């Protein structure tokens, strides 16, 4: 009898059920700062204590996380959504680097590659994070570059490195030794049994410190010349992308076999864009444009709006089956249609985000998972004709040939590591109404360091494909941004901020963010309950990394998933694997307008958490 009651309990809607969390909700009234490293959250707190706004604090936290190699470096990329309380609008910061001169389909194929490489100088897009940080600060912040870089510069002078990063360096030391400047920075004990720093050891990055000092020096000189705060920050930006720093990045990259030239850095610009959005049951959800995977979450919400998720019950077999298939449909479109909208052809986003198109896609969801689900044709829903109609029929054939499917023994560690690779998040909010959500990434360990700059280069070229049958919108060419997994999120309700949320984890990001959002909106969880709740991950989409594998029907569930749920999912055609955790750390801020306060949440593992006041 007890088992029957338990089964009923677990499939009931979550409403009214109290859940004990391992971490407490973070409460604040004046400001909140949440990110992937405690020291980086402290950097944000320092800026808030000096009178900075949420953008100033986010920039300081971004600088600190990049300095601490929290799955990113200064040569990586930054994506941000910012709510501006003055204009009452959400804006998007596109600081994704692009493909350098010579980075073409023919070039990579001539190197014997099926995809651009995972690591090394040929994996590098141009640095985006410095430009993204300085643009956000100049346009929406209040403080100087010197002030917001001060914590990062102190860290570069030496900080006690944490075990996670220290061990990551040690585990990747053979790859690091291939690149002389990386070896110099990362392996202070070269020749000893352990060549990486030990946990707690003071990790010094003198070259990076000097690079940051040059930016501050340039800002100071501009201010002495009666330049405005904004002009002085952009002068520093100019030095990074067109001055001596750029020259050393190019020299050091080319010395190690890379493609950068000086015009690649000089011509790259940050873009301030209109985000994409859909309305889900009265909540406007904002994501970056289709050069990210962000719209896949919006497509999933449109599809799921056609189902009564609450009545299915939180993480019931029916719920998991429905959400899994909705994600599969959205990600099949991602894999074929998404790409840099600055290049032709442009992705059919109007059709892809159409509610009518979502109804058509929702009609494909059945009681059994379809492992062969492919992209749809959104062009009729925006009054157009699909220029790649002929490729839709061959898409599934190409994927089947290139990918062997799920191995009998289940998902292996290397595959999961690739699928969930990299990234961190930065979430800030203040009493004035500014809200920032960032998912910076790129340049994770093992990274190629560009000459004597201390700047680790991105590895994001690998997210391009070389076969138009896989995605005709995402083929590499100079100046083009790859379709990346990075995906900050903001939600608005009744014209006011409702939720800022982001997560690390590669292709799993928008899957976990979707479930987190539904946990709050459909099942009435608070922000911490939603962050700690069990998620599931699909591998039916193509990985954006490495060999771009696909595992049709594969699903990872948390290892405490009840046996009757496992049994039902097996009947529905799923190939299950079970892990202690199934999500990268989610960081989020929920806005309590009834009491005028912030509620912060972060997953109950990893180093992510925050500080508030």
List PLM regions with ranges.
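Noncatalytic scaffold domains of N-terminal-nucleophile
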Residues: 19-42, 46, 50-235, 240-292, ...
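Short Gly/Pro-enriched turn/cap motifs at secondary-structure boundaries
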Residues: 71, 122-123, 200, 275, ...
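Internal maturation/activation junctions in enzymes
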Residues: 309-441, 580
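Active-site rim segments in enzyme catalytic domains, especially the processed small/beta chain
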Residues: 67-92, 109, 251, 256-261, ...
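M16/insulysin-pitrilysin zinc metalloprotease superfamily fold
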Residues: 294-310, 491-499, 506-531
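Extended C-terminal subregions enriched in glycine
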Residues: 432, 479-481, 513-514, 522-581
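Bacterial Sec-dependent N-terminal signal peptides
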Residues: 1-20
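Active-site Gly/Thr loop motif
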Residues: 259-281, 362, 367-417, 457-486, ...
């Amino acid at each position: 009898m007890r088992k029957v009651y338990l089964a009923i309990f677990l499939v009931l809607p979550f409403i009214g059920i109290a859940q004990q969390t391992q971490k407490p909700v973070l409460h604040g009234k004046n400001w909140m700062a949440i990110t992937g490293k405690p020291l980086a959250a402290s950097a944000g707190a320092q800026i808030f204590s000096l009178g900075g706004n949420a953008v100033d604090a986010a920039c300081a936290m971004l600088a600190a996380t990049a300095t601490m190699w929290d799955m990113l470096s200064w040569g990586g990329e930054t994506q941000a959504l910012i709510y501006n309380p003055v204009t009452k609008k959400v804006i998007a910061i596109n600081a994704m680097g692009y493909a350098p001169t010579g980075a073409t389909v023919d070039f990579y194929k001539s190197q014997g590659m099926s995809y651009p490489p995972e690591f090394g100088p040929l994996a590098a897009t141009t640095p985006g994070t410095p430009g993204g940080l300085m643009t956000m600060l100049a346009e929406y912040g209040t403080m100087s570059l010197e002030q917001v870089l001060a914590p990062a510069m102190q860290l570069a002078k030496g900080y006690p490195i944490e075990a996670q990063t220290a061990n990551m360096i040690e585990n990747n030391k053979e790859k690091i030794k291939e690149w002389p400047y990386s070896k110099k920075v990362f392996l202070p004990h070269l020749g000893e049994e352990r060549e990486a720093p030990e946990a707690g050891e003071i990790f010094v990055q003198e070259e990076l410190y000097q690079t940051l000092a040059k930016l501050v020096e340039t800002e100071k000189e501009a201010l002495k010349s009666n330049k405005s705060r904004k002009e002085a920050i952009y002068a520093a930006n100019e030095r990074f992308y067109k001055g001596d720093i750029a020259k050393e990045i190019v020299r050091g990259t080319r010395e190690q076999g890379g493609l950068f030239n000086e015009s690649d850095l000089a011509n790259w610009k940050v873009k301030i864009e209109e985000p994409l959005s859909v309305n889900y049951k009265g909540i406007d959800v904002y994501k970056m444009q289709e050069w990210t995977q962000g719209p896949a979450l919006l497509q999933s919400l449109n599809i799921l709006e056609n189902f009564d998720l609450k009545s299915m019950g939180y993480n019931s077999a029916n719920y998991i089956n429905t959400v899994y298939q909705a994600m599969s449909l959205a990600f099949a479109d991602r894999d074929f249609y998404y790409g840099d909208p600055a290049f032709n052809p442009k992705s059919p986003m109007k059709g892809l985000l159409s509610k009518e198109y979502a109804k058509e896609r929702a009609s494909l969801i059945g009681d059994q998972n379809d492992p062969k689900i492919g992209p749809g044709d959104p062009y009729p829903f925006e009054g157009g004709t699909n220029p790649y109609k002929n490729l839709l029929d061959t898409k599934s054939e190409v994927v089947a040939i290139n990918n062997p499917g799920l191995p009998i023994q289940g998902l292996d560690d290397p595959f999961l590591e690739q699928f969930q690779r990299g990234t961190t998040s930065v979430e800030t909010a203040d009493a004035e109404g500014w809200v920032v959500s960032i998912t910076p990434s790129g340049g994770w360990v093992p990274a190629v360091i560009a000459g004597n700059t201390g700047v680790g280069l991105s590895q994001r070229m690998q997210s391009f494909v070389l076969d138009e049958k896989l995605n005709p919108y995402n083929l590499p060419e100079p100046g083009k941004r790859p379709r990346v997994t990075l995906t900050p999120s903001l939600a608005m309700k009744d014209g006011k901020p409702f939720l800022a949320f982001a997560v690390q984890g590669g292709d799993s990001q928008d899957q976990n963010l979707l479930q987190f959002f539904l946990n709050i909106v459909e099942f009435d969880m608070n922000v911490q309950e939603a962050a700690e709740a069990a998620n599931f991950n699909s591998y039916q989409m193509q990985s954006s990394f490495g060999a771009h594998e696909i595992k049709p029907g594969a699903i990872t569930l948390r290892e405490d998933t009840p046996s009757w749920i496992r049994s039902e999912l097996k009947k529905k055609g799923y190939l299950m694997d079970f892990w202690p955790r199934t999500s990268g750390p989610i960081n989020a801020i929920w806005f309590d307008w009834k009491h005028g306060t912030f509620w912060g949440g972060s997953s109950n593992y990893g180093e992510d958490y925050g500080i508030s006041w």
